[in-house]
Amino acid sequence: FVILNKKQRGKVMFKKMPVCRLMISCPSDVKTEVEIINRVVDNINDSIGISMDIFVKTLYWSKNVMPEAGNYPQSIINKQILDKSDAIIAIFGNRIGSPTQHYESGTIEEIELMIQKGKQVFVYFSDKPVRKSEIDMEAETKIQAFKEKYKDRGIYVVYASDEEFNDYVSMHLTRYLTTELANEVNRVNEHTRFDDSISQRKEVDLIYDYTKFYDI
């Protein structure tokens, strides 16, 4: 490594990059999909993230939630992760998850709250082959009811394999980020026409409906 003298150290600067906080929400039966999302995000950060000066940070309850007394578990997750997230990826396999105070499951509550906040929502349903012994008919009924509720809103995609899920997530996140960064640059340029002293925001609110560019 290189040792810098005081004069040289004074010139070292770290680049500030917009950060997209991406929440991962799912029941416990889609662990493979969570791993895929993390790999896709790593690839994005190493490719277009570097060229476009943006960093995607994934947030997942098992890694990013600290114990907190006095509140319901879902309220803690909402406070520590959801309220700070710019977008959410939700995945359903064969389970719908544990119920909360107000919704059928924690994942459904997180989807609903992000929609209410006007944030970006990506929802994926697995159609991968399943053993009969793993099928939960009650959960399946609830999942189908949830899909029926949102079918006209175009907020979800069905995938049939891990490879297809990987391709969907990579495509949707890439287009989402590039579109939002382009929109942010346009917003900044529009403002600077009237005020040359304005500085670009450190973080970008990433809100975009990917169904506008992808035909589900």
Region annotations inferred by a language model:
Residues 3, 8-216:
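Conserved catalytic or regulatory cores that recognize and/or transform ribose-phosphate-containing ligands
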